[in-house]
């Protein structure tokens, strides 16, 4: 149940971003007041304009997104390591679930204490998986408002796109959904077990991105395409699921070979005793 609650929380947070994004509509400039408008949205816009090589706002958004992803790289790497540790603890967690299978409050309290102790001993935070999303939500909100509320960016174009309007050909929403699926699917491949909520997330998130992409500014779809393409490449480079699976298969093969060797070593002794 907790896994489904976490899934609903993440979906709700994404929706909340765009509800809040629509709240501010007044143009943002150097004379704007308020911490959000003056120091976040305004400076996001300035950064995008600075990176808009040749006056192309689209290039500015692409470069800005890459800079943000590079800054977040240590956090994402930490998240990946933490998730792998959590997966390695699954056999011990299952043993705890069997030990404290009763649903009475006292047993469940003991289970939670043992679970937290296991996490603490292995330096694992099971909620770290939500952290990158929580960090990126205000970035997406600020980017959306910078494009829609700063006149110089609002009038920007890129290739066939008017950046303050949805992509008329749906190319960016489709690419955003494809790269979102690729990044989430590759991440789930490296896990020992994929629970039901993660399987659902593999399809729910791309669908949400697509449907929001067909109705929101194409600047946001461009951000999603670049961000999730970067995430896909990062996963293949730093947490390659194909390599991890091969390593696990090799480790399992070696473990079985050691077991067979021990059995063969014990067999002559048993025969000798019979004589």
From Swiss-Prot:
Topology of the protein relative to the lipid bilayer: Multi-pass membrane protein
Basic and acidic residues bias (residue ranges): 249-266
One Gene Ontology MF term: membrane insertase activity
Predominant subcellular localization, coarse grouping: membrane
GO biological process: protein insertion into membrane; protein transport
Compartments, as annotated in UniProt: Cell membrane
Signal sequence bounds: 1-22
Sequence intervals crossing the membrane: 53-73, 127-147, 169-189, 206-226
Residue span of region Disordered: 249-275
Cited InterPro entries: YidC/ALB3/OXA1/COX18, YidC/Oxa/ALB_C, YidC/YidC1/YidC2_Firmicutes, YidC_ALB_C
Gene Ontology CC entries for this record: plasma membrane
Lipidation (N-palmitoyl cysteine): 23
Lipidation (S-diacylglycerol cysteine): 23
Pfam assignment, any one: 60KD_IMP
Record keywords, A-Z: Cell membrane, Chaperone, Lipoprotein, Membrane, Palmitate, Protein transport, Signal, Transmembrane, Transmembrane helix, Transport
Family note: Belongs to the OXA1/ALB3/YidC family. Type 2 subfamily.
Function statement: Required for the insertion and/or proper folding and/or complex formation of integral membrane proteins into the membrane. Involved in integration of membrane proteins that insert both dependently and independently of the Sec translocase complex, as well as at least some lipoproteins.
NCBIfam families named among the record's database cross-references: yidC_oxa1_cterm
The protein's name: Membrane protein insertase YidC
Record organism: Enterococcus faecalis (strain ATCC 700802 / V583)
Gene designation: yidC
């Amino acid at each position: 149940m907790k896994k489904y609650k976490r899934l609903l929380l993440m979906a709700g947070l994404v929706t909340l971003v765009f509800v809040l994004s629509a709240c501010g509509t007044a143009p943002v400039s150097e004379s704007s007041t308020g911490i959000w408008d003056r120091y976040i949205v305004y400076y996001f816009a300035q950064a995008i304009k600075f990176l808009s090589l040749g006056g192309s706002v689209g290039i500015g958004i692409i470069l800005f997104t890459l800079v943000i992803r590079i800054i977040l790289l240590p956090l994402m790497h930490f998240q990946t390591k933490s998730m792998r540790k959590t997966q390695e603890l699954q056999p011990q967690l299952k043993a705890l679930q069997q030990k404290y299978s009763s649903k009475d409050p006292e047993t469940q309290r003991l289970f939670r204490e043992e679970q937290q102790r296991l996490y603490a001993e292995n330096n694992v935070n099971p909620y770290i998986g939500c952290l990158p999303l929580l960090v990126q939500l205000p970035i997406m909100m600020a980017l959306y408002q910078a494009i829609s509320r700063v006149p110089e960016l609002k009038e920007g174009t890129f290739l066939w796109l008017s950046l303050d309007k949805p992509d008329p050909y749906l190319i960016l929403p489709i690419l955003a959904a494809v790269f979102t699926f690729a990044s989430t699917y590759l991440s789930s491949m490296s896990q020992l077990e994929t629970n039901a909520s993660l399987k659902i997330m593999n399809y729910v998130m791309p669908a949400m991105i697509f449907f929001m992409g067909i109705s929101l500014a194409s600047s946001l779809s461009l951000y999603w395409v670049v961000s999730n393409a970067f995430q896909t490449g990062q996963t293949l480079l730093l947490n390659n699921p194909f390599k991890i699976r091969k390593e696990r298969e090799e480790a399992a093969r070696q473990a079985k070979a050691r077991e067979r060797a021990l059995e063969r070593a014990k067999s002559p002794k048993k025969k000798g005793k019979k004589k």
